[in-house]
Amino acid sequence: AIAGMAFFDSVESFNMIRGGHIDITVLGALQVSKNGDIANWMISSRGIGSIGGAMDLAENTPTVVVTMEHTTTNNEPKIVENCSYPLTSKGCVNLIVTDVAIIEVIYSDTDNIHLLLKETAPGWTKTDVQKITAVELIFQHLPKA
């Protein structure tokens, strides 16, 4: 074993998650809504996938980072007004990292949530990213493209 490494079973991992001992989690997603909701599983009749431990992680971890491609294979946006897949958790996402952008979810209050475009991938402009995002992004603090 490498120093600092730990091995544990799923029972212990859920105890750590549910006990609030995890500071940050990184989850994949099918969709993220403008309100920071995450959908990362689907109904089996609509495709593969099922519920796993993501609900526990999303609900019991203070910082939730989502990593995903920005669009589907059909070029549909994955950052959307409202998730069309079953929700994993509501209002939990803090940061979205896609193949073209890094977007911070800013929770001013429950009625005032913004998606701040923090960074674009090389060769992408803020306008390019906005065109493939289904909701409005804010650009303050972003260098002009």
Predicted regions and their residues:
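Conserved phosphate- and dinucleotide-binding cores of soluble alpha/beta proteins
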Residues: 1-145
